């Protein structure tokens, strides 16, 4: 992946930023994509390794796009694979489908990299292929969000020749943000079909000490009961959303979608979750309240790991789920294998258990039984 040119600058002028990052949802003549990036190592201090700006033309060949220029630069630096890197982009437009495909490949090949994309605007958000591309980015593990006022101010301070002037939001800035935020949330609110292998192995590995697993992933199956027999109906994958208003965990994402689009009082449901983490106290409480109100829903939760199982609030959350009829269990080998076969783009590769899977299962299962006694 070698673009024919690289167009990088340290900072941009104020008028350039205001023109190209103007967050009006529909704009013409903004044919240059600006990508401000930061690369940090993960850790307590998280030192910033580099921060610059790439430019690219939206109507040129994909290899000339700003996203591809960044990937060429990053891969060309041959940064050590044993270190974990946190990449943040502030972009004037969200990536096109071609760039998204390359980004998904990049993230699959670099499990030590996390990518957050904060966009000023959504590119062709009404077109099906572009909406699917945003969902694919999320499936690949990237975080996608709309730039808010704090992020605009941060870019102004760090990527603009501001000459000491503060960032001043323009007319209808808040209205534009609210519209784009709602639109992106609607695009990403529906469940994904599956996840990529590196996502599954990283987030569902049942380690005793699972450092860096700061996201919750939830695979679900849903059966409706007809003529006293369950009939398979729906399945999918949720992950926690980057939402400055709600910080929506995967469990809340499921409940929101289920209540708005699926739930009927005249239908009985058998729902099974396979989660990377057990629910936090707030989510456990909401799920317990939901089950108390809807006796037509039976829920079984298989979890790869117990979240803060030594904390009494988290223990009480698990007990509240059990008291409202939810079955809470630890994922074992057959459950991981089932998820691999049904919720992962596995290319017909078999599930490969990791060292310590059975031992960790026994440890977590004993802890769960102690909590639920």
From Swiss-Prot:
Lineage top rank: taxon: Eukaryota
Gene3D superfamilies: Cytidine Deaminase, domain 2
Effect listed in the UniProt record for changing residue 251 to A: Decrease in cytidine deaminase and antiviral activity
Species: Homo sapiens
Gene assigned in the entry: APOBEC3F
Lineage: Eukaryota, Metazoa, Chordata, Craniata, Vertebrata
Effect listed in the UniProt record for changing residue 290 to K: Resistant to HIV-1 Vif and reduces Vif binding but is still efficiently incorporated into the virion
S-S bonds: 280-283
Role: DNA deaminase (cytidine deaminase) which acts as an inhibitor of retrovirus replication and retrotransposon mobility via deaminase-dependent and -independent mechanisms. Exhibits antiviral activity against viruse such as HIV-1 or HIV-2. After the penetration of retroviral nucleocapsids into target cells of infection and the initiation of reverse transcription, it can induce the conversion of cytosine to uracil in the minus-sense single-strand viral DNA, leading to G-to-A hypermutations in the subsequent plus-strand viral DNA.
Required co-factors: Zn(2+)
Enzyme class: hydrolase
Reaction catalysis annotation: a 2'-deoxycytidine in single-stranded DNA + H2O + H(+) = a 2'-deoxyuridine in single-stranded DNA + NH4(+)
Record annotation: effect of changing residue 251 to Q: Remains able to bind Vif
Effect recorded for residue 265 to A: Impaired interaction with HIV-1 Vif protein
SUPFAM superfamilies in the record: Cytidine deaminase-like (SSF53927)
UniProt PTM comment: (Microbial infection) Following infection by HIV-1, ubiquitinated by a cullin-5-RING E3 ubiquitin-protein ligase complex (ECS complex) hijacked by the HIV-1 Vif protein, leading to its degradation.
One GO CC annotation: ribonucleoprotein complex
Tissue expression notes: Widely expressed. Highly expressed in ovary.
Assembly and interaction partners: Homodimer. Interacts with APOBEC3G in an RNA-dependent manner. Interacts with AGO1, AGO2 and AGO3.
Residues forming the catalytic site: 251 (proton donor)
Chain residue numbers at which the record places covalent cross-link (Microbial infection) Glycyl lysine isopeptide (Lys-Gly) (interchain with G-Cter in ubiquitin): 52, 234, 334, 352, 355, 358
Phenotype upon changing residue 67 to Q: Reduced but not abolished antiviral activity. Nearly abolished antiviral activity
The protein, known as: DNA dC->dU-editing enzyme APOBEC-3F
PANTHER family: DNA DC-DU-EDITING ENZYME APOBEC-3F (PTHR13857:SF45), MRNA EDITING ENZYME (PTHR13857)
Localization annotation: Cytoplasm; Cytoplasm, P-body
Activity modulation comment: (Microbial infection) Antiviral activity is neutralized by the HIV-1 virion infectivity factor (Vif), that prevents its incorporation into progeny virions by both inhibiting its translation and/or by inducing its ubiquitination and subsequent degradation by the 26S proteasome.
Keywords: Antiviral defense, Cytoplasm, Disulfide bond, Host-virus interaction, Hydrolase, Immunity, Innate immunity, Isopeptide bond, Metal-binding, Repeat, Ubl conjugation, Zinc
């Amino acid at each position: 992946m070698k673009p024919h040119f690289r167009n990088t600058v340290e900072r941009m002028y104020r008028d350039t930023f205001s023109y190209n990052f103007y967050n009006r949802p529909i704009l013409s003549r903004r044919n240059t994509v600006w990508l401000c990036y930061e690369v940090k190592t993960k850790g307590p201090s998280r030192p910033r390794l580099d921060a610059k700006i790439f430019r690219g033309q939206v109507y040129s060949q994909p290899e000339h796009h700003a996203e591809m220029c960044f990937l060429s630069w990053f891969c060309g630096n041959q940064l050590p694979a044993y270190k974990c890197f946190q990449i943040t982009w502030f972009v004037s437009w969200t990536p096109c489908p071609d760039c998204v495909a390359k980004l998904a490949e990049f993230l699959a090949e670099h499990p030590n990299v996390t990518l957050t994309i904060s966009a000023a605007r959504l590119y062709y958000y009404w077109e099906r292929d572009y909406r699917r591309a945003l969902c694919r980015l999320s499936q690949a593990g990237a975080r996608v969000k709309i730039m808010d006022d704090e992020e605009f101010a941060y870019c102004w301070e760090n990527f603009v020749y501001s000459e000491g002037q503060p960032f001043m939001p323009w007319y209808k800035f808040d209205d534009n943000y609210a519209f784009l935020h709602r639109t992106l949330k609607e695009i990403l609110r529906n469940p994904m079909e599956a996840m990529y292998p590196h996502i599954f192995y990283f987030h569902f590995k049942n380690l005793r000490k699972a450092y860096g697993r700061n996201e919750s992933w939830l695979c679900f199956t849903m059966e409706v009961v007809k003529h006293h027999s369950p009939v398979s109906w729906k399945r999918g994958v949720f992950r926690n959303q980057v939402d400055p208003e709600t910080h929506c965990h995967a469990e809340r994402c499921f409940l929101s979608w289920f209540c708005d689009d699926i739930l009927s009082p005249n239908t009985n449901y058998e729902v099974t979750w396979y989660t990377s983490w057990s629910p936090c106290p707030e989510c456990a409480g909401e799920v317990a309240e939901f089950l108390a109100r809807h006796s037509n829903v039976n829920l079984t939760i298989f979890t790869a790991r117990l979240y803060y199982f030594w904390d009494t609030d988290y223990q009480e959350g698990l007990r509240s789920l059990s008291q409202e009829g939810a079955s809470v269990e630890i994922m074992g080998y057959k459950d991981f294998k089932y998820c691999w076969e049904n919720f992962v783009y596995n290319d017909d590769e078999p599930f490969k258990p990791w060292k310590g899977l059975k031992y960790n299962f026994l440890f977590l299962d004993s802890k769960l039984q102690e909590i639920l006694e």
